[in-house]
Amino acid sequence: VLTFNAKRHRYHYNFAENKILNAYKLDASWADYDFCPANGYLAFTEGNNLRILSPDNTVGIVTDETADGIVCGKSVHQNEFGIHKGTFWSPGGSALAFYRMDESMVTDYPFVNITTRCATAEPHKYPMAGMKSHEVTVGVYNLETKKTVWLKTGLPKEKYLTNIAWSPDEKSIYIAELNREQNEMHLVRYSALTGEKEADLFTETDEHYVEPQHPVLFLPNNPDQFIWQSERDGYNHLYLYNTEGKLLKQLT
């Protein structure tokens, strides 16, 4: 399937069937598009809020934040630790996990925009060392109930929530949680239905830093096992785990 934009429309074209599967009318203020092939919905942000667009071009409101410094559905943690987006569709398309970031406590830092004719100053929130950092939470929006469940990630609030992944049955969400010192990582499983923590599967530590870059990857023929990519021994290797956090074997 080829995805492309033209004249403020987004199209999904199927080469095998030689036809357009979906055509969405876009607004100039929308960004951060995330298409779900399972249900044909398109997640996007409008300002600092998250929306969804159905195949019949009906817009649904996921968040309606009005306070300054609250951002939903966008990439967080300065795009570190493999983070490049802020929305995560469940495999079957029944739910949408997303980041909510509160950066109201973070001071502004004057970045310079050099793409303008004359360079202009553009303040952005940037957490300086030793000062307050932003606080991130993860919501799970159910398309049927139109309600959001928040994962109970707990304290400390300044930890990094990285590498979000869904279980194949859509019942659980896996998150690599990293402390602000970046030297201790916990792979944690949460219930996508209640938000409760289900298990702390394993921990990685390093005297210098731990840098998770990839979410868990489930085996297509075994939903009870996943591959974890790590540099825990100083080299980039793959490890096979079961969903209870037991290391089955080192693959590379």
Where are these regions (language model features)?
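Beta-strand C-termini and the immediately following turn/loop, strongest in propeller blades
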Residues: 2-9, 14-15, 40-49, 54, ...
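Beta-propeller and related beta-repeat scaffolds in trafficking/envelope systems
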Residues: 129-134, 156-157, 203-217, 252
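Asp-box/WD-like beta-propeller blade repeats and closely related beta-sheet repeat scaffolds
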Residues: 7-52, 58-86
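Beta-propeller fold detector
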Residues: 21-25, 59-67, 149-152, 197-203, ...
